Amino acid sequence: MKQIYILAIIVLASCNFSNQKEKSQEAWTFNEFVKLDSANPILSPDTSYRFNCPITNKPVQWQSKNVLNPTAFVKEGKVYLLYRAQDSAMTSRLGLAISEDGIHFIKQAAPVFYPAKDSFLKYEWKGGVEDPRIVQTPDSSYLLTYTSYDGKTARLCFATTRDLIHWEKRGPVLQSPKYINTWSKSGAVIVERVGSQMIAKKINGRYWMYFGDTNLFMAYSTDLLHWEALENAESKILVNVLSPRAGYFDSRLVEPGPFALYTKKGIVLIYNSSNAANNNDSTLPKFTYSAAQVLYDKSIPYKQIDRTKTYFIHPDKPYEKIGEVNEVCFVEGLVYFKDQWILYYGTADSKIAVAIANHKL
Protein backbone atom coordinates (compact mmCIF):
# COMPACT_ATOMS: atom_id res chain seq x y z
CA MET A 1 0.00 0.00 0.00
CA LYS A 2 2.88 2.30 0.88
CA GLN A 3 4.51 1.62 -2.50
CA ILE A 4 1.28 2.51 -4.32
CA TYR A 5 1.04 5.75 -2.34
CA ILE A 6 4.63 6.70 -3.21
CA LEU A 7 4.02 5.86 -6.88
CA ALA A 8 0.91 8.06 -6.89
CA ILE A 9 2.91 10.96 -5.47
CA ILE A 10 5.57 10.53 -8.17
CA VAL A 11 2.97 10.43 -10.94
CA LEU A 12 1.18 13.48 -9.52
CA ALA A 13 4.45 15.40 -9.21
CA SER A 14 5.34 14.49 -12.79
CA CYS A 15 1.97 15.73 -14.04
CA ASN A 16 2.33 18.97 -12.07
CA PHE A 17 5.82 19.52 -13.51
CA SER A 18 4.51 18.91 -17.02
CA ASN A 19 1.60 21.30 -16.49
CA GLN A 20 3.93 23.96 -15.05
CA LYS A 21 6.23 23.59 -18.07
CA GLU A 22 3.29 23.96 -20.47
CA LYS A 23 2.01 27.01 -18.58
CA SER A 24 5.52 28.49 -18.59
CA GLN A 25 5.69 28.10 -22.35
CA GLU A 26 2.22 29.56 -22.80
CA ALA A 27 3.31 32.61 -20.79
CA TRP A 28 5.82 33.78 -23.39
CA THR A 29 4.25 32.77 -26.70
CA PHE A 30 1.79 34.46 -29.00
CA ASN A 31 -1.30 32.30 -28.56
CA GLU A 32 -4.40 31.46 -30.55
CA PHE A 33 -4.04 33.30 -33.82
CA VAL A 34 -7.34 32.74 -35.61
CA LYS A 35 -7.48 32.93 -39.40
CA LEU A 36 -10.08 35.43 -40.57
CA ASP A 37 -11.96 33.18 -42.98
CA SER A 38 -14.60 35.83 -43.68
CA ALA A 39 -11.98 38.08 -45.33
CA ASN A 40 -9.15 35.80 -46.47
CA PRO A 41 -7.32 36.05 -48.70
CA ILE A 42 -7.12 39.82 -48.16
CA LEU A 43 -4.85 40.55 -51.16
CA SER A 44 -4.63 38.78 -54.51
CA PRO A 45 -2.78 39.32 -57.82
CA ASP A 46 -4.26 41.91 -60.15
CA THR A 47 -3.49 42.49 -63.84
CA SER A 48 -4.97 46.00 -63.85
CA TYR A 49 -1.98 47.57 -62.05
CA ARG A 50 0.68 48.85 -64.46
CA PHE A 51 4.04 50.45 -63.86
CA ASN A 52 6.74 51.71 -66.20
CA CYS A 53 9.82 49.64 -65.38
CA PRO A 54 12.90 51.93 -65.20
CA ILE A 55 15.15 49.07 -66.35
CA THR A 56 13.32 48.08 -69.52
CA ASN A 57 11.50 51.41 -69.96
CA LYS A 58 8.36 49.43 -70.73
CA PRO A 59 5.03 49.14 -68.91
CA VAL A 60 4.69 46.01 -66.80
CA GLN A 61 1.77 44.45 -64.93
CA TRP A 62 3.84 44.42 -61.79
CA GLN A 63 1.51 42.36 -59.58
CA SER A 64 -0.10 40.14 -62.18
CA LYS A 65 1.47 36.83 -61.13
CA ASN A 66 1.61 36.69 -57.31
CA VAL A 67 1.38 38.82 -54.17
CA LEU A 68 2.97 37.39 -51.05
CA ASN A 69 5.07 37.69 -47.91
CA PRO A 70 4.13 41.11 -46.51
CA THR A 71 5.54 43.15 -43.66
CA ALA A 72 3.35 45.59 -41.74
CA PHE A 73 3.46 48.57 -39.40
CA VAL A 74 1.11 51.10 -37.83
CA LYS A 75 1.30 54.78 -38.71
CA GLU A 76 -1.15 57.55 -37.78
CA GLY A 77 -3.84 55.07 -36.79
CA LYS A 78 -3.66 53.01 -39.97
CA VAL A 79 -2.03 49.72 -40.92
CA TYR A 80 0.50 49.90 -43.74
CA LEU A 81 1.29 46.70 -45.60
CA LEU A 82 4.45 46.41 -47.69
CA TYR A 83 4.07 43.33 -49.82
CA ARG A 84 6.06 41.45 -52.43
CA ALA A 85 4.51 41.39 -55.90
CA GLN A 86 5.62 39.45 -58.97
CA ASP A 87 5.02 40.14 -62.63
CA SER A 88 4.73 37.45 -65.31
CA ALA A 89 8.54 37.27 -65.59
CA MET A 90 8.68 36.59 -61.81
CA THR A 91 10.51 39.84 -61.06
CA SER A 92 9.64 41.02 -57.55
CA ARG A 93 8.84 44.56 -56.43
CA LEU A 94 7.33 45.91 -53.22
CA GLY A 95 3.83 47.35 -53.20
CA LEU A 96 2.08 49.35 -50.48
CA ALA A 97 -1.49 48.93 -49.25
CA ILE A 98 -3.19 50.92 -46.47
CA SER A 99 -6.05 49.97 -44.16
CA GLU A 100 -8.25 51.72 -41.60
CA ASP A 101 -9.19 48.45 -39.85
CA GLY A 102 -6.23 46.17 -40.52
CA ILE A 103 -8.34 43.88 -42.70
CA HIS A 104 -9.53 45.75 -45.79
CA PHE A 105 -6.70 47.32 -47.75
CA ILE A 106 -6.43 49.82 -50.57
CA LYS A 107 -3.44 49.20 -52.83
CA GLN A 108 -1.29 52.03 -54.13
CA ALA A 109 -1.14 52.14 -57.92
CA ALA A 110 2.63 51.72 -58.33
CA PRO A 111 5.29 49.84 -56.39
CA VAL A 112 7.14 51.91 -53.79
CA PHE A 113 10.40 49.93 -53.81
CA TYR A 114 11.87 48.23 -56.86
CA PRO A 115 15.01 47.60 -58.95
CA ALA A 116 16.21 50.78 -60.63
CA LYS A 117 19.19 52.03 -62.61
CA ASP A 118 21.33 52.55 -59.53
CA SER A 119 24.47 51.07 -58.00
CA PHE A 120 22.46 48.18 -56.53
CA LEU A 121 21.06 46.94 -59.84
CA LYS A 122 23.73 44.23 -59.98
CA TYR A 123 22.20 42.70 -56.85
CA GLU A 124 18.51 43.19 -57.74
CA TRP A 125 18.06 42.37 -61.41
CA LYS A 126 16.39 40.39 -62.74
CA GLY A 127 14.97 38.60 -59.73
CA GLY A 128 14.03 41.80 -57.94
CA VAL A 129 13.47 42.75 -54.31
CA GLU A 130 11.74 40.22 -52.08
CA ASP A 131 10.33 39.45 -48.64
CA PRO A 132 10.40 42.78 -46.76
CA ARG A 133 10.58 43.29 -43.00
CA ILE A 134 10.29 46.80 -41.59
CA VAL A 135 10.87 48.33 -38.14
CA GLN A 136 10.96 51.85 -36.77
CA THR A 137 14.26 53.34 -35.62
CA PRO A 138 14.72 55.44 -32.47
CA ASP A 139 14.87 58.61 -34.61
CA SER A 140 11.41 57.82 -36.09
CA SER A 141 12.64 56.73 -39.50
CA TYR A 142 12.18 53.21 -40.87
CA LEU A 143 14.63 50.39 -41.49
CA LEU A 144 13.68 47.91 -44.20
CA THR A 145 15.42 44.57 -44.63
CA TYR A 146 14.77 42.70 -47.86
CA THR A 147 16.23 40.07 -50.14
CA SER A 148 17.82 41.14 -53.41
CA TYR A 149 18.01 38.47 -56.08
CA ASP A 150 20.13 38.73 -59.21
CA GLY A 151 18.89 35.42 -60.59
CA LYS A 152 21.73 33.46 -59.02
CA THR A 153 22.46 34.66 -55.49
CA ALA A 154 20.07 35.99 -52.86
CA ARG A 155 21.52 38.66 -50.58
CA LEU A 156 20.08 40.14 -47.41
CA CYS A 157 19.98 43.90 -48.02
CA PHE A 158 18.56 46.93 -46.25
CA ALA A 159 17.26 50.42 -46.90
CA THR A 160 16.04 53.40 -44.87
CA THR A 161 13.25 55.95 -45.30
CA ARG A 162 11.40 58.64 -43.40
CA ASP A 163 8.31 58.97 -45.58
CA LEU A 164 7.95 55.59 -47.39
CA ILE A 165 8.34 57.47 -50.68
CA HIS A 166 12.01 58.39 -50.76
CA TRP A 167 14.19 55.37 -50.01
CA GLU A 168 17.93 55.15 -49.51
CA LYS A 169 19.22 51.73 -50.45
CA ARG A 170 22.15 50.70 -48.28
CA GLY A 171 23.18 47.48 -50.00
CA PRO A 172 23.94 44.08 -48.46
CA VAL A 173 23.76 43.80 -44.68
CA LEU A 174 26.94 41.72 -44.67
CA GLN A 175 29.44 43.97 -46.44
CA SER A 176 32.66 42.13 -45.66
CA PRO A 177 34.33 40.41 -48.65
CA LYS A 178 33.89 37.12 -46.80
CA TYR A 179 30.09 37.28 -47.00
CA ILE A 180 29.02 39.82 -49.62
CA ASN A 181 28.69 37.25 -52.39
CA THR A 182 27.28 34.44 -50.26
CA TRP A 183 23.61 33.45 -50.07
CA SER A 184 21.72 35.25 -47.26
CA LYS A 185 18.07 36.10 -46.59
CA SER A 186 15.43 37.22 -44.13
CA GLY A 187 16.58 39.78 -41.56
CA ALA A 188 14.46 40.13 -38.40
CA VAL A 189 15.57 42.99 -36.15
CA ILE A 190 14.95 42.86 -32.39
CA VAL A 191 12.41 45.53 -31.40
CA GLU A 192 10.55 46.75 -28.35
CA ARG A 193 6.86 47.62 -28.55
CA VAL A 194 6.05 51.23 -27.61
CA GLY A 195 2.29 51.55 -28.03
CA SER A 196 1.71 50.38 -31.58
CA GLN A 197 5.24 51.17 -32.74
CA MET A 198 7.93 48.49 -33.04
CA ILE A 199 11.21 50.28 -32.36
CA ALA A 200 14.66 48.77 -32.82
CA LYS A 201 16.05 47.86 -29.39
CA LYS A 202 19.66 48.10 -28.26
CA ILE A 203 20.87 45.25 -26.06
CA ASN A 204 24.27 45.64 -24.41
CA GLY A 205 25.03 48.59 -26.68
CA ARG A 206 24.13 46.80 -29.91
CA TYR A 207 21.19 46.32 -32.23
CA TRP A 208 20.64 42.71 -33.28
CA MET A 209 19.21 40.91 -36.27
CA TYR A 210 18.36 37.24 -36.82
CA PHE A 211 18.80 36.03 -40.40
CA GLY A 212 19.12 32.93 -42.57
CA ASP A 213 16.95 30.45 -44.45
CA THR A 214 18.44 27.09 -43.50
CA ASN A 215 19.71 27.71 -39.98
CA LEU A 216 19.44 31.02 -38.14
CA PHE A 217 22.43 33.29 -37.58
CA MET A 218 22.86 36.81 -36.20
CA ALA A 219 24.29 40.19 -37.13
CA TYR A 220 24.83 43.19 -34.88
CA SER A 221 25.28 46.95 -35.25
CA THR A 222 25.81 50.01 -33.07
CA ASP A 223 24.02 52.39 -35.45
CA LEU A 224 21.65 50.24 -37.61
CA LEU A 225 23.77 51.13 -40.65
CA HIS A 226 26.96 49.12 -40.29
CA TRP A 227 26.43 45.44 -39.56
CA GLU A 228 28.79 42.63 -38.58
CA ALA A 229 28.09 38.92 -38.61
CA LEU A 230 28.20 37.18 -35.24
CA GLU A 231 31.07 34.72 -35.52
CA ASN A 232 32.70 32.14 -33.30
CA ALA A 233 35.94 33.76 -32.14
CA GLU A 234 37.90 30.54 -32.59
CA SER A 235 36.55 29.07 -35.82
CA LYS A 236 35.51 32.37 -37.45
CA ILE A 237 32.29 30.79 -38.70
CA LEU A 238 28.76 32.09 -38.17
CA VAL A 239 27.20 31.32 -34.80
CA ASN A 240 24.19 29.06 -35.36
CA VAL A 241 21.33 30.11 -33.05
CA LEU A 242 18.52 27.89 -34.41
CA SER A 243 18.55 24.67 -36.43
CA PRO A 244 16.03 22.31 -38.03
CA ARG A 245 14.89 19.34 -35.93
CA ALA A 246 14.70 15.81 -37.34
CA GLY A 247 11.27 14.30 -36.86
CA TYR A 248 9.53 17.67 -36.54
CA PHE A 249 7.57 20.05 -38.77
CA ASP A 250 10.74 22.20 -38.96
CA SER A 251 13.01 19.37 -40.10
CA ARG A 252 14.07 20.91 -43.43
CA LEU A 253 14.83 24.56 -42.66
CA VAL A 254 14.12 27.48 -40.35
CA GLU A 255 13.79 31.15 -41.35
CA PRO A 256 12.84 34.33 -39.43
CA GLY A 257 9.27 35.59 -39.50
CA PRO A 258 8.55 39.24 -38.58
CA PHE A 259 10.69 41.31 -36.18
CA ALA A 260 11.88 39.66 -32.96
CA LEU A 261 10.00 41.10 -29.96
CA TYR A 262 11.77 42.10 -26.72
CA THR A 263 9.52 41.22 -23.75
CA LYS A 264 9.81 40.73 -19.98
CA LYS A 265 10.12 36.98 -20.52
CA GLY A 266 12.78 37.28 -23.22
CA ILE A 267 13.05 37.82 -26.97
CA VAL A 268 10.22 36.14 -28.85
CA LEU A 269 10.91 35.22 -32.45
CA ILE A 270 8.24 33.81 -34.73
CA TYR A 271 9.99 31.68 -37.32
CA ASN A 272 8.97 29.99 -40.54
CA SER A 273 9.90 26.39 -41.18
CA SER A 274 9.70 23.65 -43.77
CA ASN A 275 9.03 19.94 -43.38
CA ALA A 276 11.75 17.71 -44.83
CA ALA A 277 11.22 15.01 -47.45
CA ASN A 278 11.97 12.34 -44.85
CA ASN A 279 12.82 12.10 -41.14
CA ASN A 280 10.06 14.66 -40.78
CA ASP A 281 6.62 15.25 -39.30
CA SER A 282 4.69 12.51 -41.06
CA THR A 283 1.35 14.22 -40.38
CA LEU A 284 2.26 17.03 -42.81
CA PRO A 285 3.02 16.84 -46.54
CA LYS A 286 6.72 17.10 -47.29
CA PHE A 287 7.99 20.67 -47.80
CA THR A 288 5.02 22.16 -45.90
CA TYR A 289 5.78 25.67 -44.62
CA SER A 290 4.40 26.40 -41.16
CA ALA A 291 5.37 28.81 -38.35
CA ALA A 292 6.45 28.32 -34.75
CA GLN A 293 8.11 30.34 -31.97
CA VAL A 294 11.38 30.43 -30.07
CA LEU A 295 12.46 32.38 -26.97
CA TYR A 296 15.91 33.90 -26.44
CA ASP A 297 17.46 35.47 -23.36
CA LYS A 298 16.68 39.19 -23.30
CA SER A 299 20.25 40.01 -22.28
CA ILE A 300 21.97 37.39 -24.45
CA PRO A 301 20.01 37.33 -27.73
CA TYR A 302 21.83 34.28 -29.10
CA LYS A 303 21.03 32.16 -26.01
CA GLN A 304 17.95 30.01 -26.58
CA ILE A 305 15.67 29.53 -23.56
CA ASP A 306 12.66 27.72 -24.99
CA ARG A 307 11.11 26.59 -28.26
CA THR A 308 7.61 25.45 -29.11
CA LYS A 309 7.20 21.80 -29.94
CA THR A 310 4.69 22.37 -32.71
CA TYR A 311 3.57 25.00 -35.21
CA PHE A 312 0.84 27.54 -34.45
CA ILE A 313 -0.18 28.11 -38.07
CA HIS A 314 -0.01 25.78 -41.06
CA PRO A 315 -1.72 25.37 -44.45
CA ASP A 316 -5.26 24.03 -44.14
CA LYS A 317 -7.20 26.31 -46.51
CA PRO A 318 -7.43 25.81 -50.30
CA TYR A 319 -5.57 29.08 -51.04
CA GLU A 320 -2.77 27.99 -48.65
CA LYS A 321 -2.44 24.50 -50.07
CA ILE A 322 -2.52 25.22 -53.83
CA GLY A 323 -0.66 28.01 -55.61
CA GLU A 324 2.72 29.00 -57.02
CA VAL A 325 4.28 26.85 -54.29
CA ASN A 326 1.91 24.41 -52.61
CA GLU A 327 1.45 23.97 -48.85
CA VAL A 328 2.74 27.35 -47.64
CA CYS A 329 1.89 29.68 -44.77
CA PHE A 330 4.80 32.14 -44.64
CA VAL A 331 4.60 34.68 -41.82
CA GLU A 332 6.31 38.08 -42.14
CA GLY A 333 3.92 40.82 -40.98
CA LEU A 334 2.83 41.54 -37.40
CA VAL A 335 1.23 44.62 -35.85
CA TYR A 336 -0.31 45.56 -32.52
CA PHE A 337 -3.42 47.44 -33.59
CA LYS A 338 -6.55 48.34 -31.62
CA ASP A 339 -5.54 46.14 -28.67
CA GLN A 340 -4.90 43.00 -30.68
CA TRP A 341 -2.09 41.34 -32.57
CA ILE A 342 -2.69 41.00 -36.30
CA LEU A 343 -0.57 38.57 -38.28
CA TYR A 344 -0.12 38.83 -42.06
CA TYR A 345 1.22 35.94 -44.09
CA GLY A 346 1.78 34.70 -47.62
CA THR A 347 -0.29 31.75 -48.82
CA ALA A 348 1.13 29.24 -51.31
CA ASP A 349 3.43 32.05 -52.54
CA SER A 350 0.39 33.47 -54.33
CA LYS A 351 -1.86 35.53 -52.04
CA ILE A 352 -1.94 37.22 -48.63
CA ALA A 353 -4.05 36.34 -45.60
CA VAL A 354 -4.56 37.51 -42.02
CA ALA A 355 -4.96 35.95 -38.56
CA ILE A 356 -5.83 37.72 -35.29
CA ALA A 357 -5.01 37.16 -31.61
CA ASN A 358 -6.18 39.04 -28.52
CA HIS A 359 -3.18 37.90 -26.47
CA LYS A 360 -1.53 40.76 -24.52
CA LEU A 361 2.10 39.65 -24.91
Task: Give residue spans per PLM region.
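Glycine-rich phosphate/diphosphate-binding loops that line cofactor/substrate pockets in enzymes
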Residues: V335
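C-terminal structured domain segments
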Residues: E324-E327, V331
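Sec-dependent N-terminal signal peptides
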Residues: I4-A13
